[in-house]
């Protein structure tokens, strides 16, 4: 959200079609049945039509087992079992430093009795070690002695996010994790970092199925009483897998849901503005500190930018949008000047990262992966029937390991500035806006798709302003006449074809974000398998 500072021939017409996603089975390694018989338990032949759900798996709203890519449901569901009586023991998955006098500090491995879990995001707990009572973030703990408490269990994580984590620099061959299967209810996936001369570093995925009697197996000849025993076995022998399990994949400590219990509308005095990061037409962005304890990003809005009542109403919706590719909204100061408090992303905006940071050295695979992450977040916004309205590189934030998160979703609708609401002048992002939205104010998820196509040009051209050499009015006129930006220099034509799909005149002919995400995640296997890095891309 902010103002825009700004001062090529038609491609061939192609028809958009929804192509089927790749066969999920093709994502998994071959069934490793060729090795010798290995120890395990015997059980009846598996019934593939009867996969019972684990009590903490599936679509359970609370995802306490972390990992860099746990997706949090907007409506957390309490764990089953009599937690209010404090009979279920939970264990800490990460260290946590108290932010308020009501919080408990704790270390990874510390055990708790849960006193009250009705609040969802923050539970009242008693430390078994110290006897102290206070609030703890519910996504930092898991039931003791459960699969969720295992370091190698990453819960609800997609194939692509598993690959991103495992392929991070520093991980060796054999680094692994276990996650819920995306395609088979009640099953799991074992993801292992591998290496071969043809593909170099890559990740193999093996489906772990569940037996009717409660056992687990990758291949029917080696069955195990528990996932723990399965992992132990394959840590000792590859036994048909691509490589022996060597090291648990390092996880990233997840963001808490909110700053603390009941810390939503916060007093301005609880925030300290430390370092100014940027300034726009409608306000400033700062690194700040909340309550003297917690580093945050703070967006300060100029008085009159938006009505406080309307903002607070929209913010209530925004804080319920929870996805690992969306910047979480932590808290607000709802009186003017409005402050918006969010997660601090260390690499700043994608636009600055591409132009002035290490982003200018990125090759096509990294750029396409960043685009896939953004499409992942937008596919969630699409599923939630929400609209961003201002999707561009300036509103994407970058963290460590090229993690991308979408910021400022929904805020553009609330801006009261006359020049902005008239959709003309320097403050309105004409070059990113679909013609039906710019001309008639028809903002939909399909106008966001148009904007995503423009964002793709920013990625490939390393932050170059769209429609170079053209002013806003000229862009609007030319686009209405059918002009579309040509293929950026050294950009594969297949990626330009995706851009042109996003720029279809009829919004209904533009692809869904679900399709775009799938296309980009499988880009180098399905669309450009022969890609070789060049001097630029």
From Swiss-Prot:
Residue ranges of domain Protein kinase in the record: 271-524
Record lipid sites (N-myristoyl glycine): 2
GO terms for biological process, alphabetical: cell differentiation; cell surface receptor protein tyrosine kinase signaling pathway
Phosphotyrosine modifications at: 420, 531
Class of the enzyme per the UniProt entry, highest EC level: transferase
SH2 domain boundaries: 152-249
Leader sequence residues: none
Lipidation (S-palmitoyl cysteine): 3
Active site: 390
Keyword Cell inner membrane included in the entry's annotation: no
Basic and acidic residues: bias regions: 1-22
UniProt-listed PROSITE patterns: PROTEIN_KINASE_ATP, PROTEIN_KINASE_DOM, PROTEIN_KINASE_TYR, SH2, SH3
UniProt GO cellular component terms: anchoring junction; centrosome; cytosol; plasma membrane
Main location: membrane
Stated family: Belongs to the protein kinase superfamily. Tyr protein kinase family. SRC subfamily.
UniProt protein name: Tyrosine-protein kinase Yes
The species this protein was found in: Xenopus laevis
